[in-house]
Amino acid sequence: MAAVGPRTGPGTGAEALALAAELQGEATCSICLELFREPVSVECGHSFCRACIGRCWERPGAGSVGAATRAPPFPLPCPQCREPARPSQLRPNRQLAAVATLLRRFSLPAAAPGEHGSQAAAARAAAARCGQHGEPFKLYCQDDGRAICVVCDRAREHREHAVLPLDEAVQEAKELLESRLRVLKKELEDCEVFRSTEKKESKELLKQMAAEQEKVGAEFQALRAFLVEQEGRLLGRLEELSREVAQKQNENLAQLGVEITQLSKLSSQIQETAQKPDLDFLQEFKSTLSRCSNVPGPKPTTVSSEMKNKVWNVSLKTFVLKGMLKKFKEDLRGELEKEEKVELTLDPDTANPRLILSLDLKGVRLGERAQDLPNHPCRFDTNTRVLASCGFSSGRHHWEVEVGSKDGWAFGVARESVRRKGLTPFTPEEGVWALQLNGGQYWAVTSPERSPLSCGHLSRVRVALDLEVGAVSFYAVEDMRHLYTFRVNFQERVFPLFSVCSTGTYLRIWP
């Protein structure tokens, strides 16, 4: 019977090799990456070769015992964790030295090809070391934005730089990326909500446009039917007059034909009587003359006396119709083309220093404190107001303003000469015609007292400026409900005006 001895085999050898490799890693200096030689421990607990840490701390002769006595009194950073450590408190680690000595007596077998990784792993390992000093990257220079080794850290190049342990730098970078990721996710959610809202609003607008197309088609169809009807009536009247003229003409011609026949016959009889001998002539003379006296004179009704009057009346209607249609076409074209919407932006040179304008110069809100801005002659230095970049002196224009739900805003138009310096009232006398939200109430800023407006919550308001008739009107965009109209005799160019006097609200030119 064979004796049973300790189990050996490939598995047992591999495990022993792995344990030996792990033990060798624990007995390896993190600076020189070799087995410890005269290991010493610092106050944080990490251990290094005495010569290695001496080089890191730039202590000439640190490898000798006498050099330790000349250690500086101030703490220096641990090469591995950056915790402060006093060089005078270095302690020899005899147990670690004994382990390193034992490991030197054994040599681990060379790894078989492919057994401990690939060329890619070797390349990664090489990339994890400093190309200048051959030391592993354990630190991160925040000023240069790159990984460095403990020897680089003590070099003059990095002496004044902010340096972190590599794991802390990685953690900080991950936290920063996570915070950015949270912001991006929030922006993504906002974009998704905006896209959904945009789709919904676009769908509603398309539906509304389809309804408007049907209305326009129906209105023009009704207009065409009306014009065809009136055309038929007028042409029918002209045809009726033509028949009357023709009938009257036929009647007159028939009557004239009878009378002409009678007169021709009588004329022939007179001529025959005149050719007879004297005695016969005298005997028939009286009867012939009597027949001439009994013949009625021609009294036909002329065409022009009655018909010309009727035709003139129809011609007058045609003339009036032509003028009315011309005016109708001009008015219709003018109504369809008037009040073209204008694209506005805010003028930064007019903005009060406390007002903060959006990057696209469409929105404005009130900041906590005044900004350091140039003292431009057009700038409002006291009133928190800003004008649009373009003004108007003629025509019809409109724009829309998105308004905040809280108190502290006003907008409308102001004349170009409105005072920019000092505190000035918000009144028509000062050249300002505006709508306002104050004290939870919407107001038309009239004079001497403001006019309260009876309207529900406003989110967007249309301003319609008609310089031809002298009017500034405000409408709730949701249902185009009329809010108020100022009647103004404009004498100069006017500019859209915006004012925000509370940090809790805003105004924005829409869209």
UniProtKB/Swiss-Prot annotation:
A molecular-function term among this protein's GO annotations: ubiquitin protein ligase activity
Subcellular locations according to the entry: Nucleus; Cytoplasm; Golgi apparatus
UniProt EC number: 2.3.2.27
Catalytic activity: S-ubiquitinyl-[E2 ubiquitin-conjugating enzyme]-L-cysteine + [acceptor protein]-L-lysine = [E2 ubiquitin-conjugating enzyme]-L-cysteine + N(6)-ubiquitinyl-[acceptor protein]-L-lysine
Coiled coil: 166-263
SMART domains: BBOX (SM00336), PRY (SM00589), RING (SM00184), SPRY (SM00449)
Disulfide bonds: none
TM helices/strands, residue ranges: none
Swiss-Prot/TrEMBL keywords: Antiviral defense, Coiled coil, Cytoplasm, Golgi apparatus, Metal-binding, Nucleus, Phosphoprotein, Transferase, Ubl conjugation, Ubl conjugation pathway, Zinc, Zinc-finger
Post-translational modification: Phosphorylated at Ser-107 by RPS6KA5/MSK1, which stimulates the ubiquitin ligase activity. Auto-ubiquitinates via 'Lys-63'-linked polyubiquitination.
Zinc finger residue ranges, RING-type: 29-82
A GO biological-process term: antiviral innate immune response
Positions with a binding annotation for Zn(2+): 130, 133, 152, 158
Pathway the protein contributes to: Protein modification; protein ubiquitination
Keyword Phosphoprotein: yes
B30.2/SPRY domain boundaries: 324-511
Top enzyme category: transferase
Stretch forming the signal peptide: none
Functional description taken from the UniProt entry: E3 ubiquitin-protein ligase that have both tumor-promoting and tumor-suppressing activities and functions in several biological processes including innate immunity, regulation of ferroptosis as well as cell proliferation and migration. Acts as an antiviral effector against multiple viruses by targeting specific viral proteins for ubiquitination and degradation including norovirus NTPase protein or SARS-CoV-2 NSP5 and NSP8 proteins.
Similarity comment: Belongs to the TRIM/RBCC family.
Comment, domains: The B30.2 domain mediates interaction with GYG1. The coiled-coil region mediates homodimerization and heterodimerization.
Protein name: E3 ubiquitin-protein ligase TRIM7
